[in-house]
């Protein structure tokens, strides 16, 4: 389990996000840039929808045969001299990782970006063991230095910070003395991290795709930090969600093309690294010992259900980058490691409805996420399924909602009441109307109009408009 992050009630987190004007501006700007780059990169292929269909087919086939490919992966990793551990829960994964680290008497660990290790709270488990865990992805490193600020985006974890804020963090925590120029900040971070690579006992990575036919893992990065994490420490541990697997390199090539274009609008990232087991005789770098931890943590419960398509996700965040709700509330409002539309679908499945039942309602159901997804996950439909499940689980709707729906039903079913309502509505709301917008709504409308305007009813009814123009 281990996923819970939420701090405060959902509506409190949302209100905080909405009133964070810098964050909203940063998110809006990033969404526009990433969306534009994604569309341009997709257009270069010329047949993007065919690529999406192929990506969907690959992911569906893999999930339908997941047990076979996981066994094939395990066998091939072991043939190459690696160790494989299947973890049913977050606790089992952390226990195994801690045992490996303790057996090496390791005290310093370098780590590349990994969502699944965030999901299982691996860093906290290792720190309890007395280890120092250093994030080497620049965004994650910034957040770690800033008192473990949680990530706000799947691909760009420090999206909610600007260069001045990062400069201040570095000045306070890393004795930084230069300006807020990104180049200078990056150089300082690189200098701080370089020594950590050289003195680390263990390297830990995530996994973009594991290749079943060879027992390889693939890491897709732009910074090169993952290469150093895997090349220098004597022991490497890779942690992957059980669904992050492809049958062969042929499928991997397709999904990497979709991933890089959808995530950051690039044909390819700067580094695409394929690692197969520990260092072999004659090789000059790489780990002496390799461990692959395959994490379930609720994923097997999703298989075979109507929510199975969510496991097709390749963690590109294209859905996040087009979501209008994310644009206004930011990633921290979700209170989960996984934000945006994919987080709203995945979090209740992995962490339970008790902690994440509000997230499926953090959506306009505009389907922009579904349209952007490179593997065609029907995200807006899955959000609706969540809502249905929540209503059935709760057993009843709030009394206020029941009364409102009943009143609307009575009015809509009666032509007399409907005519009367449409006639008096403009007059009834007139005291609350300014420039054809209700800015201070009465009763249940107040919660809406406190943060956004509500369109006022038209003064002229459609029936009257049509009657006047019927003879034209």
UniProtKB/Swiss-Prot annotation:
InterPro entries: 4Fe4S_Fe-S-bd, 4Fe4S_Fe_S_CS, FTHF_cligase-like_sf, Helical_ferredxn, LUD_dom, LutB, LutB/LldF, LutB_C. One of its GO terms (molecular function) is 4 iron, 4 sulfur cluster binding. It comes from the Bacteria. The keyword Electron transport applies. [4Fe-4S] cluster 2 binds at residues 323, 366, 369. Residues 304-334, 353-382 form the 4Fe-4S ferredoxin-type domain. Gene3D superfamilies: Alpha-helical ferredoxin, NagB/RpiA/CoA transferase-like. Keywords: 4Fe-4S, Electron transport, Iron, Iron-sulfur, Metal-binding, Repeat, Transport. The keyword Transmembrane does not apply. Belongs to the LutB/YkgF family. HAMAP family: LutB. Is involved in L-lactate degradation and allows cells to grow with lactate as the sole carbon source. Has probably a role as an electron transporter during oxidation of L-lactate. NCBIfam families: LutB/LldF family L-lactate oxidation iron-sulfur protein (TIGR00273). This is Lactate utilization protein B. It comes from Anoxybacillus flavithermus (strain DSM 21510 / WK1). The lineage of its organism: Bacteria, Bacillati, Bacillota, Bacilli, Bacillales.
């Amino acid at each position: 389990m281990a996923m819970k992050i939420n701090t405060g009630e959902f509506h409190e987190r949302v209100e905080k996000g909405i009133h964070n004007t810098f964050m909203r501006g940063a998110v809006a700007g990033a969404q526009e840039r990433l969306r534009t780059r994604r569309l341009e990169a997709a257009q270069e292929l010329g047949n993007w929808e065919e690529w999406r269909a192929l990506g969907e087919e690959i992911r569906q086939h893999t999930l339908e045969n997941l047990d076979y490919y996981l066994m094939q992966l395990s066998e091939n990793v072991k043939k190459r001299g690696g160790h494989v551990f299947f973890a049913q829960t977050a606790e089992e994964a952390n226990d195994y990782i801690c045992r490996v680290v303790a057996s090496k008497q390791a005290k310093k660990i370098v780590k590349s970006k990994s969502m699944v290790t965030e999901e299982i709270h691996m860093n906290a488990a290792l720190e309890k063991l007395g280890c120092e865990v250093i994030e080497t992805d620049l965004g994650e490193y910034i957040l770690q230095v800033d008192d473990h600020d949680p990530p706000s985006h799947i691909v760009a974890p420090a999206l909610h910070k600007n260069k001045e804020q990062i400069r201040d963090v570095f000045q306070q925590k890393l004795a930084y003395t230069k300006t807020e120029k990104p180049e200078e900040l990056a150089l300082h971070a690189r200098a701080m991290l370089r020594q950590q690579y050289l003195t680390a006992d263990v390297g830990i990575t995530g996994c973009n795709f594991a290749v079943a036919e060879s027992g390889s893992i693939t890491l897709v990065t732009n910074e090169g930090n993952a290469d150093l994490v895997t090349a220098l420490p004597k022991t490497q541990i890779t942690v992957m969600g059980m669904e992050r697997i492809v049958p062969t390199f042929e499928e991997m090539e397709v999904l990497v093309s979709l991933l890089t274009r959808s995530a950051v609008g690039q044909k390819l990232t700067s580094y695409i690294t394929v690692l197969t087991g520990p260092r072999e005789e004659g090789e000059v770098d790489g780990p002496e010992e390799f461990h692959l931890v395959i994490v379930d943590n609720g994923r097997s419960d999703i298989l075979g259900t109507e929510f199975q398509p969510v496991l097709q996700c390749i963690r590109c965040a294209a859905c996040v980058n087009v979501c209008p709700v994310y644009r206004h509330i930011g990633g921290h409002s979700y209170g989960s490691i996984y934000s945006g539309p994919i987080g709203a679908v995945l979090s209740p499945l992995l962490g339970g409805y008790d902690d994440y039942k509000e997230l499926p309602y953090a959506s306009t159901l505009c389907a922009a996420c579904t349209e952007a997804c490179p593997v065609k996950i029907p995200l807006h439909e899955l959000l609706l399924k969540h809502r249905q499940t929540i209503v059935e689980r709760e057993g009843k709707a709030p009394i206020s909602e029941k009364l409102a729906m009943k009143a609307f039903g009575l009015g809509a079913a009666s032509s007399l009441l409907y005519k009367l309502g449409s006639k008096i509505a403009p007059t009834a709301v007139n005291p609350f109307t300014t420039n054809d917008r209700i800015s201070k709504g009465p009763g249940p409308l107040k919660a809406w109009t406190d943060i956004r305007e509500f369109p006022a009813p038209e003064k002229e009814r459609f029936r009257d408009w049509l009657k006047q123009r019927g003879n034209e």
